[in-house]
Amino acid sequence: MAGILLVAFLSLAFGTTEGASGSSWSYGESDGPGHWESAYPNCGLNRQSPINLPNSQDMVYNSDLKPFMLKGFKNPQDYKLKILNNGHTVQVNVEEGDLTVEGGGLPGRFKTAQFHFHWGSDNMRGSEHLSDGSSYPMELHVVNYNEKYGSLSNAASKERDGLAVLGFFFVISDEENSGLRTMLNKFKDVKTNGAMTELTSFSIESMLPLAVGNPDHFYRYSGSLTTPPCHESVVWTIFENAISISEQQMAMFRKLLEDNLTNGTHVIVNNFRPVQPLGERQVMRSFELNSASNIHLSSLALFLFLVCFI
């Protein structure tokens, strides 16, 4: 019963069509992000997500942002996962297991509840957050709740420290990402809205780039859920290192359907909220700048800028 209730809330808070008020929402024109505030007032508050992450030079260095400790993510036999198409995204729920996130300057110990994706109709868009004005083809959100609140539903309604979401950008690569293969093989079973199945033998750790490059390089700000009801209870972390994905693998996401019919024609694409005003909030970085990192960031920005015009 607890698992059913958890799935029900996850669907409500992170991607169903119907909210508690019965109001519908989507990413379309009639009930898309520009209309969310009328049914979900929180969506019009001043600490909303996503945002445009400024250049690292314009961020504030925070020495308290130490490396993360992710526990329980490595061995698939230690947890039970279910993969779901909720009509807005593909989502993987943690049904059983003790997956936790702490460190990284987080205000406590957080329990992992689910992860999901946002992607575009092409490689020029898709991520919810922007990096100095540039978009990525996809973004992964790993959703965790503060254990002191006891449950995801209780934590999501709290102020500022209820949830911790880890965000990762994706970049297109010539090589297939083997860490995604097991999950992508299940897409045929969750092609339509409402479809759900078990996801076995999938190592969450293998999907994440935390063991590659600089896992202690990340950005931090205070924000909200990026879907209704838009609670401003999220400690956001966006990692500098991106996850690679091949063109063929990316195409599999774009074949998932909003419809609950196998012959449906409405594919899930452009399921991202536009960036929201940063306002008086600060974006912090976990690392000090040096000439090498400045060159890296400048080169990345130039590459993304040039790609837009090829």
Predicted regions and their residues:
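Alpha-carbonic anhydrase
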Residues: M1-I310
